[in-house]
Regions:
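Glycine- and aromatic-enriched mobile tails/lids
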Residues: 1-4, 21, 25-27, 31, ...
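Short beta-strand to alpha-helix junction loop
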Residues: 77-87, 125-141, 155, 206-214, ...
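Glycine-rich loop(s) and the adjacent beta-strand/alpha-helix scaffold that form part
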Residues: 191-247, 315, 395-418
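Beta1/beta-strand and adjacent pyrophosphate-binding region of the FAD-binding site
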Residues: 1-14
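Core beta-strand elements of the Rossmann-like FAD/NAD(P) dinucleotide-binding domain
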Residues: 2-4, 182-191, 380
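Conserved redox-cofactor binding core of oxidoreductases
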Residues: 98-183, 188, 195, 239-250
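Conserved N-terminal glycine-rich FAD pyrophosphate-binding loop of Rossmann-like flavoproteins
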Residues: 35-68, 234-237, 244-248
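An anion/pyrophosphate-binding glycine-rich loop and adjacent beta-alpha core
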Residues: 219, 226-346, 350, 418-424
Length: 594
């Protein structure tokens, strides 16, 4: 019996879990990561991971977790996979605990849980404020065990360029580039699982790592893989402003009692500690008394925008609000939030234990991503699977805080075995594919590199990237207007024309970051158009997608998944009905209990 082979692209939580599941099935895995695995963006996840264990006796259940997730996502998520994820979540926590993740515990020794946005229950297990790091390190230890046994081979410092497709449109492997030697190679595989994370670089400044470009998703899209719900971009309400990039201030700060406020008087320039409580506007608590500072992220973000831009109550002219932890005991802050407080203190030079933090919304997450089916994390292209933030399945129009980590782990747990079943069911594996198929793709990618290196143009790729980011951030984040979306798409097409005249400052063939960035830039521009066109088409407001011209949710016309496809060099949009068989849609309100 032939031995199949699986490739996993991406070394974050979803990629590592998929790798573990494939290796457990006895199938060899090649794991590709653009950075060392422990530097994958999952390491930046702070607040925790959701599971309805009900250890605090509040009456929580997996059904309530499921309802909160569908309701929080404004009913746009297909319901059966979300239900399966919520039912699997308690077992995932137990698995991670056995792997050695250092979750916080109560004095009795039980796992501790905190409350996050969009729920009234303490449902979020956490490891201080560095939950992603602890989980990533624990999973990598398991992968390294398989690596020592020869079941896993890592390719760190390699970037994915394209899938290798045979003449019938089936994926037979990947083409990748070594970022040191710039060598382009093809790697045969019976199936490939893509766990390539977020797309923050499309918006220039975001809370994402700089390697989160969406380039892999875009490359697959241009090879025929469908992309779903691209228009749904999560803007986190509490990011730490920065000139170079944004840094996240976790929702856990509010989960532990942090309060968001601004001075009631516009232009009040007094230091925050000198402003009496009666002169502070705790707007989230006033507008949403049931959920307070833990309303879902899209609602909190729009509220902050309203306070700053419409009511003109920013902090002394700055687009910012206060996130106040100064009333919380120092011991509690150091035990539960030390990691994120150190980040704020390091970059802004202010101790948030004694002075309120200045925060403002920033691009954080994409609910949209690669289209996958409801059962196997399989795309529309045979042999290609996806898991984690790069796919669209679990969060609908708005992700609840701490659902991302559980969706990463669950997606990897499903994709791994599904890819093994597919590979074992093939009549002919990748070893039977003619060598010319792989050589053809390798040569195509080599020629693209050579063309970029030879190009004698006048355009700077960094300047094009900054323009793209500025337009996307201004027009395709919190508030969308059709005329602005039309202008943005026209600008993106102009940037694509200018891209044809780029000039690379580095023409060497060793560790050429400029070449890799130029390749990624083209893919980012294509994916930016997918996002913008999806937003332009959707004439309603749902979750993170808000249009003042169409302020209401429109279930009659838009309770549909946007599915983008690449059609001979142009972007075509389809709209599929959403599975609402388990929970009928209802009005989404957070000013009162559900």
């Amino acid at each position: 019996m032939r031995q199949p082979k699986i490739i996993v692209v991406g070394g974050g939580l979803a990629g590592l879990m998929a790798t573990i599941r494939v290796a457990e099935a006895g199938v060899p895995v090649e794991l590709f990561s653009i950075v060392p695995v422990k530097r994958s963006h999952s390491v930046c996840a702070q607040g925790g991971i959701n599971a309805a264990k009900n250890t605090k006796g509040e009456g929580d259940s997996t059904d309530k977790h499921f309802d909160d997730s569908i309701y929080g996502g404004d009913f746009l998520a297909n319901q059966r996979p979300v239900k399966a994820m919520c039912e699997a979540a308690p077992g995932i926590i137990d698995l991670l605990d056995r792997m050695g993740v250092m979750f916080n515990r109560t004095p009795e020794g039980l796992l501790d849980y905190r409350r996050f946005g969009g729920t009234l229950y303490n449902r979020t297990a956490f490891a201080g404020a560095t939950t992603g790091q602890q989980m990533l390190y624990a999973l990598d230890e398991q992968v390294r065990r398989f690596e020592a046994e020869g079941k896993v081979k890592k390719y760190e410092g390699w970037t994915f360029l394209s899938a290798v497709m045979d003449d019938s449109g089936v994926s037979r492997g990947v083409c990748a580039m070594d970022l040191k030697s710039m060598e382009v190679r093809t790697f045969p595989a019976d199936a490939a699982i893509f766990c390539t994370g977020g797309i923050g670089a499309i918006f220039a400044r975001s809370t994402n790592s700089v390697v989160c470009t969406g380039s892999a998703q875009s490359a697959l899209f241009q090879q025929g893989v469908h992309y779903a719900n691209g228009e749904f971009i999560q803007v986190h309400p509490t990011a730490i402003p920065g000139e170079d990039k944004l840094r996240l201030m976790s929702e856990s700060a509010r989960g532990e009692g942090g309060r968001v406020w601004v001075p009631k008087k516009s232009g009040d320039s007094r230091p925050p500690r000198q402003i009496p409580a009666g002169e502070r506007f705790y707007f989230l608590e006033e507008w949403y008394p049931k959920y307070g500072n833990l309303v879902p992220r899209d609602i909190a973000t729009r509220a902050i925008h309203n306070v700053v831009f419409e009511m003109k109550l920013g902090l002394d002219g700055e687009p910012a609000v206060y996130l106040d932890l100064t009333h919380i005991p120092r011991e509690t802050l150091d035990r539960k939030l030390e990691g994120i407080l150190e980040i704020y203190e390091k970059f802004l030079g202010v101790d948030p234990r004694v002075e309120p933090m200045k925060v403002f919304p920033g691009m954080h997450y994409t609910m949209g991503g690669i289209w996958i089916d409801n059962q196997n994390q399989a795309t529309n292209v045979s042999g290609i699977y996806a898991a984690g933030e790069c796919e669209y399945q679990y969060h609908g129009a708005n992700r609840l805080g701490a659902n991302s980590l559980v969706s990463c782990i669950y997606g990897g747990m499903v994709a791994g075995p599904a890819s093994v079943r597919y590979a074992r069911g093939l009549d002919k594996g990748c070893e039977s594919v003619e060598a010319s198929v792989f050589e053809r793709e390798r040569k195509r990618q080599e020629e693209l590199n050579e063309r970029l290196l030879r190009q004698e143009g006048s355009e700077n790729p960094i300047a094009i990237w900054k323009e793209m980011g500025a337009w996307m951030t201004e027009h395709v984040t919190v508030v969308r207007r059709n005329k602005d979306l039309e202008r943005t798409d026209a600008k993106l097409q102009e940037l694509l024309e200018r891209y044809k005249k780029i000039n690379l400052s580095d023409r060497t063939k060793w560790s050429n970051q400029t070449l890799n960035f130029a390749r990624e830039l083209y893919n980012m521009l294509i994916l930016a158009r997918v996002i913008t066109l999806g937003a332009l088409a959707r004439n309603e407001s749902r979750g993170a997608h808000y249009k003042p011209e169409f302020p209401e949710r429109d279930d009659a016309n838009w309770l549909k998944t946007t599915r983008a496809m690449w059609d001979c060099g142009s972007i075509k949009l389809l709209h599929d009905p959403v599975d609402i068989s388990l929970i009928p849609p209802r009005a989404r309100r957070y000013d009162v209990a559900k």
